[in-house]
Structure formats: structure tokens, C-alpha cells
């Protein structure tokens, strides 16, 4: 039997979460008649998620949490050790290529869920990691979402972000930049989980628990103070990576390189070759960089037909070397 979401709850959700009002009227109406679905990581044959069903679940849950402060406190305690669930339950992600519904609940496919668990394992064990990724797999979005979770739930935490150019770290209004991603995630989060925070250029501060996310660019990476973890975005493409390594060495316990490949012999490649590939549930080996690979085959929407069509296009245009780097990780 089809469950419905109370009209009052729907109206409250859209009034309390103003950015979602941008939905078309027919989308809002459709949510009222949807079977709520509690989001979880999906396998290939389960993809894509029913995003309206996720919003329907959120609406019902928010109505319960707002009416029961003790239950809300319990929910916050539960989520404080489960970043993957908090992200899927309450964060949104963005795809500008879609004609409509560009914002959607951040429901993971399996490899994304494993990546968030990988990040938490690194922090819990004080190890460094490396993410070798193909393009368009959501690795940066997953890392931004994890950073926001940590900002909210880990008191007095300090997370660093760096990339080779300042505009890649933060550019107001550009969701391709790292800090704009995180500002947008916070902007779209329900008020019951949202702390009092301040978001300025390359810095986000949680005023309630003292946690901070800070950004740096180019040769300045690693020179802004100590952090619990530091994300180096597209680190295979840095101009002077050894200089950055020297700065970061004593400033963080957990350094995370996230990048597509960029040839042989650079710091990213050497670290990748010397590392140990991480596996879910396997004890992390101390002293080795933990390696996490996201391949195009991990993405449910990247089929063999997609691969063949994309490769043929690059071949016609004389760009197979770019395809090999960005898709094949070669």
C-alpha cells in the first residue's frame, strides 16, 4: 500500500529548507505521494536512487526530530560516528549537467560509501592515504561532505584543503571550487543539524564547537598551521610537490592525496607505487600510505557502451592520451 507524506510536513520541509523551494511545483506535489525510502549505498543493479523518496523520508524524520528533543540528541550522537549515513541522510550534491533537479540527495553508490569509510579509517588510525581516481566519480564531493560532517561533529577539529590554484580551492559562486561545494552543502542542510558557523574566503568555522576547515593554494599548502587531516586535491599536478611535502610533513597526522594520474616519477606516482591498497574491514598496516582506487567501472552510470563511445570520440579528435589519463588512469 502506498504511504503518503502529510501535507503539513511537506510544507514545513520546504519552508524550513528554503533553497529547495526552487523545485518545480509538480516536483513538490509528487513528494507528497511518494513511499519514503531511507537512503543506503546502492549496488549497480539498484541504481539510480529514487530521490523523491529520499526527500519524503527526510520530511517524515524531520517532523519526528523537531517534536522530540531527546530523540534529536540521540540522532546526533548516532551520526557522530557514522559519517556515511549522515551524508546520505541529510546532505545534497549537485550536478549542473542535468536539465532539471540539479540538486539531489547525496546517495552513494557502493564505492563512494567505501571511500567515506576509508577516510574515517585513516583518521581513526592516524595514517595517510591516496585516492587514485577517474574523472567524474564524486571523490572530491565525498571528501567535502566528510569534511562538513567532521566540522559539525568533531569538536576542536582542524581540516586543511589545498590545490594547485587559489580559484580551485575557493571561488565564490563556482561549485567547482572546493569551499563553494562545502558552503552549498551547509546551506542546504536541515536546521536541526546545522550549527552556528561562519564561512569566509577559504575558511569555515563552527562557532559552537571550535572546529575549522581552512584552505591554501600552491606553494603555501601546509604552511597555515597544524591539522588533524589535510586533503591535497589533484596533487599529481602540483608544480613543486616536494616543497609542499616538506611543509606538510610535521603539520598533520593524516595527509590525503586525491588526484587523477599525471605520468610517472612524480610524488603522487611514487607514493602510489609504495602504498598498500586499502580493503574494507582489513586492518590498516602502519607506516604505509593507504591507497584507494576509484575506477570508471565503479560508477553505475559508466557502462561499457559509455566507455566505448567516449573512447571513440577522443580517438577521432587525437586525444587518446587524455582519455588514458582521465578515464583509464593510465
Label the model's feature ranges.
Residues 2-330:
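Phosphate/NTP-binding elements of NTP-utilizing enzymes
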Amino acid at each position: 500500500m502506498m504511504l503518503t507524506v502529510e501535507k503539513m510536513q511537506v510544507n514545513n520541509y520546504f519552508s524550513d529548507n528554503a533553497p529547495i523551494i526552487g523545485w518545480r511545483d509538480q516536483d513538490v506535489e509528487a513528494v507528497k505521494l511518494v513511499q519514503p525510502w531511507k537512503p543506503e549505498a546502492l549496488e549497480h543493479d539498484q541504481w539510480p536512487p529514487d530521490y523523491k523518496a529520499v526527500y519524503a523520508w527526510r520530511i517524515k524524520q524531520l517532523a519526528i526530530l523537531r517534536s522530540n528533543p531527546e530523540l534529536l540528541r540521540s540522532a546526533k550522537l548516532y551520526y557522530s560516528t557514522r559519517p556515511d549515513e549522515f551524508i546520505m541522510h541529510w546532505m545534497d550534491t549537485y550536478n549542473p549537467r542535468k536539465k532539471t533537479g540539479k540538486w539531489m540527495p547525496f546517495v552513494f553508490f557502493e564505492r563512494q560509501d567505501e571511500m567515506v569509510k576509508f577516510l574515517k579509517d585513516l583518521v581513526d588510525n592516524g595514517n595517510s592515504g591516496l585516492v587514485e581516481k577517474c574523472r567524474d566519480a564524486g571523490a572530491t564531493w565525498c571528501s567535502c561532505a566528510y569534511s562538513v560532517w567532521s566540522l559539525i561533529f568533531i569538536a576542536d577539529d582542524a581540516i586543511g584543503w589545498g590545490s594547485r590554484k587559489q580559484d580551485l580551492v575557493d571561488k565564490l559562486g563556482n561549485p567547482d571550487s572546493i569551499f563553494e561545494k562545502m558552503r552549498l552543502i551547509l546551506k542546504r542542510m536541515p536546521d536541526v543539524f546545522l550549527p552556528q558557523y561562519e564561512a569566509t574566503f577559504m575558511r569555515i568555522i563552527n562557532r559552537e564547537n571550535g572546529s575549522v576547515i581552512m584552505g591554501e593554494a600552491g606553494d603555501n599548502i601546509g604552511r597555515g598551521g597544524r591539522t588533524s587531516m589535510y586533503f591535497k586535491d589533484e596533487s599529481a599536478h602540483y608544480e613543486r610537490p616536494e616543497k609542499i611535502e616538506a611543509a606538510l610533513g610535521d603539520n598533520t597526522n593524516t595527509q590525503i592525496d586525491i588526484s587523477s594520474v599525471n605520468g610517472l616519477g612524480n610524488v603522487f606516482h611514487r607514493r602510489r607505487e609504495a602504498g598498500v591498497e586499502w580493503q574494507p574491514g582489513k586492518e590498516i598496516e602502519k607506516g604505509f600510505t593507504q591507497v584507494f582506487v576509484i575506477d570508471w567501472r565503479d560508477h553505475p552510470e559508466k557502462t561499457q557502451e559509455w566507455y566505448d563511445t567516449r573512447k571513440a570520440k577522443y580517438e577521432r579528435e587525437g586525444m587518446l592520451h587524455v582519455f588514458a589519463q582521465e578515464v583509464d588512469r593510465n
